Amino acid sequence: MICRRPRGIVKVLTFLAITAALPASGQAPIETLHVPELDAGFHLLYELKPGEARKQFEIWHESNPEDPLGSASVAASYLFEECIQQGVLTSKFFLDNKLFLGKIPLHPDPTLRAAFFAADKQAQDLAQQRLRTHPGDANALFAMTLSLGMEADYASLIDKHQLDSLKMVREADKYAQRLLVAAPDAADAYLGLGVANYIIGSLPGIKKFFLGFAGIHGDKRVGLQQLAIAAAGGHYLRPFAKILLALAALREKKPELARTQLKELVAEFPENTLFASELAKLNVPAAK
């Protein structure tokens, strides 16, 4: 989306309202988006067990070689692992403008990087094959939205290539809009869009001016709302959205919102030391 007016957050909330009314309208959620084997893999991922998570994803992909969700899930595991290794998902990173918004790229693991882009490309290739014959296929649209959104996140968070990130988010948004027609409950679609909107909206004025001159806009408010949508109604990416929302909330001086997200994450994933550590940091001032 990268904050296009007037089609922005109003349209997103309209789709969520449609989702809430699904039983009355007779439309059912797209169940194929919710695969138990992938659920198990993502749970392992959020317990900081990326290797075990990938085994789950790869087993499912071997049984469903033409479905792009398997490859997209594998790519997500590499991105999450890279973010953990680089310290991206910490308050130290988010609250330091030099780290969060600076031009200096991080130093990703070459093996993880190559594996991420390979899995991400495979997901897009498989998705495009499906869309050529089934343009409304929910899994394919979700895989395209997710894979492009992850590329955008990698570009902005790891490589610090904001313009490249924006180009990919614009493309991801096209698939997100189509996805929400096919599957109005697919709130995961807003994770990548929310991250990019928030980061671009947080840039210093001069940088935003030049991007705006080129017709590219970011909006922190819209980004936070999109992250909140994914955190509340997402499926596979809900915990990812919750930690990002918590960290963004800390930047915006909204500690209670951050605390709520972190408490819920710690309760759901007790083996995740990162979530527990961030909650402990937040609780130190409150305990004094």
Regions found by a protein language model. Name each.
Residues S73:
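N-terminal carbohydrate-binding/catalytic regions of secreted carbohydrate-active enzymes
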Residues F240, L247-K288:
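A cross-kingdom marker for long, charged
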Residues K11-P23:
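Bacterial N-terminal signal peptides
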Residues M1-G8:
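N-terminal secretory signal peptides that target proteins for export/translocation
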Residues G26-I30, A286-K288:
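Compositionally biased, proline/threonine/alanine/serine-rich low-complexity intrinsically disordered stretches
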Residues A28-E37, L44-Q56, E66, S77-G136, ...:
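Short coil/linker segments at helix-helix boundaries
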